[in-house]
C-alpha cells in the first residue's frame, strides 16, 4: 500500500520527476511498537535533502502526521518516505515544478535482519565504485543506480 499525497493509491504519473530523473530524496525508518523510531531525525534528513536539492516542500506537519499514522498499530515494520519534486514539463528545468509529491509505504521488517544480528554478515569488495559529488554527499537522493549495480553484482556472484 502506498500513500501518495495523502491518498491510498499505487500509481504515480509518468511525468513525475522521481521517474524522469530520480529527482527527490527519501528516508527509511523502523517501526517498533507502533512508533516510528527516530521520527524527528528522519524529518530532518528529508528537510536537509529538500533544501540541498532545492525542492520546495512545505507540508512537514502533514508528513509527520502521516508517518505516525502509518506506524500506529504495527508491532514492527519499515516505513519508506519519498519526496519527489513532482510533475513537470519536459527537460531538466524544474521551474514549473511547484507541487512536490510525497510517497509513503510500509512493509514488513525483513526477517533476515534477525539472522544477520545473530550470525553476522560476510563482507566483500564490489567492483562498482561510488561516484563522488560533494554537493550530493550524504543525501539519500533517488538516483541509487550505483547501489542497484552493487546489489546485482552480489546476487550474481553469491557474495
What are these regions (language model features)?
Residues 70-74:
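Phosphate/pyrophosphate-binding loops at sites that engage ATP/ADP/AMP, CoA/4′-phosphopantetheine
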Residues 78-83:
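ATP-grasp fold ATP-binding core
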Residues 1-68, 84, 89, 93-159:
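Helix-start/capping segments and mature chain N-termini
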Residues 75-77, 159:
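Short coil/turn segments at beta-strand junctions that form active-site/ligand-binding loops
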